């Protein structure tokens, strides 16, 4: 996958992560960063622990923040404070969703809390012991925030 390739380039000396800041696309609401199903945990396991990135420069929405407006505003301010996103790595979901932004006629522009569709819950069930354990909501960057990145790379 893409994180394996980035790690390989780092090991060869082709990439240096020491000055990189990362802002993750999304995180499940109600899941702690130490939970093995969180995106925070996933990134630590698959990239951050394998390269020379400073952990204080890695940012993921706080899935445990119950105050949705506060968390979304905090994340948008964080991104703005970093000068925006230089490179946005994206994957496409089973139905074309980007982050947890489901296909729609109108998109939310900024980071927001979204209720996951039944199809997305079913698709993500494979990562959990049961369907009931799949979170029903997530924080996700909005399409406007994603599109404001200077470059976008879609991994499929």
Briefly describe each language-model feature range.
Residues 1-2, 77-103:
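A glycine-rich beta-strand to alpha-helix segment
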Residues 6, 71, 75-79, 142, ...:
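Generic hydrophobic alpha-helical segments
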Residues 26, 62, 91-92, 102, ...:
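Short, structured patches in soluble enzyme cores that scaffold and shape functional sites
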Residues 1-12:
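Glycine-rich N-terminal segment of FAD-binding domains in flavoprotein oxidoreductases
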Residues 99-143:
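Class I SAM-dependent methyltransferase SAM-binding "motif I" and its flanking Rossmann-like core
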Residues 149-156:
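Channel- or pocket-lining gating/hinge segments that regulate access to a cavity or pore
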Residues 15-87:
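Ligand-binding beta-strand-loop-alpha-helix segment within the catalytic cores
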């Amino acid at each position: 996958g893409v994180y394996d390739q980035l790690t390989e380039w780092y090991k060869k000396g082709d990439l240096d992560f020491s000055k990189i800041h990362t802002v993750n696309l999304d995180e499940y609401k109600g899941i702690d960063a130490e939970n093995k199903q969180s995106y925070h945990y996933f990134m630590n396991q698959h990239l951050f622990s394998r390269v020379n990135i400073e952990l204080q420069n890695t940012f993921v929405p706080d899935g445990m923040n119950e105050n949705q407006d506060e968390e979304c505003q905090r994340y948008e301010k964080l991104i703005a404070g970093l000068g925006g996103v230089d490179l946005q790595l994206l994957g496409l979901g089973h139905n074309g969703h980007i982050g947890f932004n489901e296909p729609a006629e109108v998109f939310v522009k900024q980071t927001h809390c979204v209720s996951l569709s039944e199809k997305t819950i079913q698709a993500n069930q494979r990562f959990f012991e049961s369907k009931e354990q799949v979170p029903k909501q997530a924080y996700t960057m909005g399409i406007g925030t994603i599109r404001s990145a200077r470059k976008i790379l879609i991994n499929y």
